[in-house]
Amino acid sequence: GTINSGGIIGPVGGVKEKLEAASRLGLDTVLVAKGTASPPDDKDFSEVNASGLNASELNASEQFINLTQYAKENLSLAVIEVSDLDEVMLYLTGAQLNHKEVIIEENQEYTEIMSSLQNLLCQRIDKIESELKKEGISVNESVLQRVREQQGKSVNATLQGDHYSAASYCFTANIMLRSFYYQEKKPSLNTLWNRFSKLEQDVEALDNDISKEPIETISDLQTYIIVKERLNDVREQIAKFKKLQQDPEQKFYEILSYAEERYFSAQAWMKFFSMNGKKLLLDKEHLQQSCRQKISEAEERQQYVSLYISEFDAQNIKERIDGAIDADKKGEYELCLIKAIQAKGDANAILSVMGVRKDVLVEVLDSKILAVKRVIAENSAEGKFPILGYSYYRYATSLKEEESYTALVYLEYAMEMSDLSLYFPEEKTFLQRISERIFITEDMWWGFVVGAAGSLILSQIFLRRKKKK
């Protein structure tokens, strides 16, 4: 099998031939990727058949041969399905490397700030609905139903303590209402120009504000990345509006609605600059290195994916990489980082499900969730709580049942965003900096301090005795 992100074992072609080769070499046990040794159940057969394959194609497809039975009866081989590298190591060595239960302790500051951010976005639904009522606009049943569905999802997420997902659902509802508002009001093209111009000014002002924020911790860096990405997104919507002069005005309303709510979201995320954390060396040099490293990793994945899917289908990944390269050239390394991470995540998501049957996808997701949890837990324990990585992780778990592929994409983003501290060393303490300059170790420095303190104590004792005499 292939080794995918998070140590997940993915399927490969020619498994039957590989088993036969293993038998000729005298092996008695072979490990294969989960879902490649046994055929799907009847339900999955019907689902695949509904996709357009005829019966002869189904029967000829290797993935529907019971390879476990075939290997046992014809090759005297035991075939064992594995999900990840931990299972592989267990079978090879008998050692359970990651047997401990993974528990993430949610950072209390994160919870408080994200809860506040959620309230801002969710209360905005009521605000927009009030605006509609003042204008005498009645929301039609179709839009209202979709808004209430998003609100319902938000309430459920809140009950589970998942404030990021709750905020995301409210954000979607806000766009729906705002778009309906503009469709009913039908503002003129001149009015639209004025709104976009005002939005453009607001974006530049907020961008100037975040450039003054000190970036000292992983939470600072991820907050900067989040706000920067949203502002860049708004800029893209403004550019799109300027290009689409011949399109129906309804398209303009949708673009404006999304851009305004995206900008509001960027403002809300500024709250996270107040969060504490372990200080790291987040200078331009290290940011540039991490940006270019991620671009390289994303390009590698994109080239690999392009071997299996069309150039058109891989276009989105290529566009993200181009965006990262462009940001790198402009010295916007934080924006470069998020775009490269998204490109790599999109490619990894495709590679993770390539050749995976639908009935096995749930197990792939579970394995990926566990891998992400481990990374988040390890970084959190070191005082480097990854606010965006954790947020994506919670959002992915909320999407798992209904939108499994989207959930997988967000898990890939979470994996990358949760381990950013790997690229940034911890900021050196005062003692470490002094020690480097005078060529003594920290232990020697402390020895000097303890020795000096001891000498001071002894001198005090000596003076007291002398006074008594």
Predicted regions and their residues:
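Peripheral, non-AAA+ core regions of ATP-driven protein-machinery
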Residues: 1-155, 165-167, 199-232, 302, ...
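Short, charge-rich, low-complexity alpha-helical interaction segments
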Residues: 114-130, 281-300, 355-370
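Long, amphipathic, charge-rich alpha-helical segments that form helical bundles/coiled-coils
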Residues: 148-152, 171-180, 219-243, 317-324, ...
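Charged, amphipathic alpha-helical scaffolding segments
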Residues: 155-183, 242-274, 325-352, 403-423
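Long, low-complexity or tandemly repetitive, helically biased scaffold regions used
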Residues: 182, 190-296, 300-312, 319-322
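Membrane-proximal extracellular "stem/stalk" segments
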Residues: 331-436
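Juxtamembrane/start-of-transmembrane alpha-helix segments at the extracytoplasmic/lumenal side
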Residues: 434-450
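C-terminal membrane-anchoring or membrane-association module
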Residues: 455-469
